[in-house]
Curated annotation (Swiss-Prot):
Keyword Disulfide bond among UniProt keywords: no
Keywords: Cell cycle, Protein kinase inhibitor
Gene: SMR15
An example Gene Ontology biological process: regulation of DNA endoreduplication
GO molecular function, one term: protein kinase inhibitor activity
Role according to the record: Probable cyclin-dependent protein kinase (CDK) inhibitor that functions as a repressor of mitosis in the endoreduplication cell cycle.
Name this polypeptide is given: Cyclin-dependent protein kinase inhibitor SMR15
């Protein structure tokens, strides 16, 4: 949904006749409304002015922002281990292969 090019929306109103006269029914919502000024007594204004004269910043150690600790460096890649072949492999070759195995009688 996009916004319309208007800067404000107006009310859509319907009027209906009653025995008391005309009645206005609001069917839309306005995005802009006027704000009425607030009137305060002079004693209430003077009490709030005394409190607002010198605002202070809390200086206790518990409310201070902690110092930034630098992040550790990124982990490094491990080096690949190279498999070195030192020539052809030699296997055990007995003169008589049957002597290597043990025969069991069951």
């Amino acid at each position: 949904m996009g916004f319309s090019g208007k800067t404000y929306h107006q009310f859509d109103r319907k009027f209906s006749e009653t025995t008391e006269g005309k009645k206005c029914v609001i069917t839309g919502i306005s995005l802009h409304s006027t704000v009425k000024p607030i009137s305060l007594s002079s004693s209430a204004v003077s009490n709030t002015e005394d409190e607002d004269l010198c605002p202070t910043t809390p200086t206790a150690d518990s409310v201070r922002i902690p110092t930034v600790i630098p992040c550790p460096p990124a982990p490094k890649k491990r080096k690949l281990t190279l498999k070195v072949s030192y020539g052809p492999r030699e296997f055990f070759s007995p003169p008589d292969l049957e002597t290597v195995f043990i025969y069991r009688t069951t």
